[in-house]
Amino acid sequence: MTFKWRSFVVLSMHIAMVSGEYPPRWGGIGSVVFHLAGHLAQRGHDVTIITRTHKQPTPQQPGVSVLQVPWLKAPMAFTRSYGKHALTELRRLHEVKPVDVVHTLLPLVSWTAKEYLWVDEHIAPVVSALNGSWIGEREGMKLAARHNEAATWKNPNDLAILLTGGYYAKYEQAGVEHSSVSVAISDSTRREFEQWYRPPEEWHCETVLYGVDHKVFRPMNHDHEEEQLAYEALRMSYDAADEAALCVRPYTATPLLLAVSG
């Protein structure tokens, strides 16, 4: 499958990124889109983000514009509400500043097959990033429930995935079928779609692993006084500050595991 570029040589593009998350929503997708948009802009591309409205200010980056659209504040249903408003904004944007490629961040935007086809015909080819799937998450919730994980039933978002994940999967299926290219964030994510969905026979899917923020996810520098003091303060706050732990020895009487939701 080929892209229908407007010229034979593309030096720079106007990329419209349709992402339900963008800072100040620093979730997994929001963080990735923020950094990806910045890198694309540094390479000379013009990037426009279409995301959900937020009361807090959006961080600015050179070469990156951010457009906000309204959305229904309801679990799962927000993906369809946001998707409709994002499509309207995408049409308006294309009239003002022609778009060369549309990048959708699934599953947080729900478009129908008809809408994907319209975008491809009237605006630009669509590249869909596969950031996991609703069915995959639903099956994960079921597995957690079988292991008596009570939080599965207490979180309204997880409960919505359990009850409506199958319904909203049809929008992901539309994206898989009608995008020029699908980009899975991992081999396991690609296998997830191959197992639970129906990719076309000539499915153009590439796996591009998401990067890691090396400034955050790195071994601690215990020779740096401020970092060591912060490390000790964290340990002390959880009453896990025996001498072995503070000296970062492999064996400690107070092992500490932090489970952080992102």
Which role fits each region the language model picked out?
Residues 194, 211-241:
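Acidic anion/phosphate-binding donor-loop and adjacent secondary structure
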Residues 18-20, 185, 208-211, 248-250, ...:
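Short hydrophobic "strand-cap" motifs at the C-terminus of beta-strands
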Residues 63-94, 153-164:
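A short, charged, and often flexible helix/loop element on the N-terminal side
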Residues 53, 188, 211:
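Carbohydrate-associated surface elements
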Residues 3-56, 62, 95-97, 122:
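N-terminal subdomain of nucleotide-sugar transferases
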Residues 15, 101, 117-156, 183, ...:
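Active-site proximal beta-strand in glycosyltransferases
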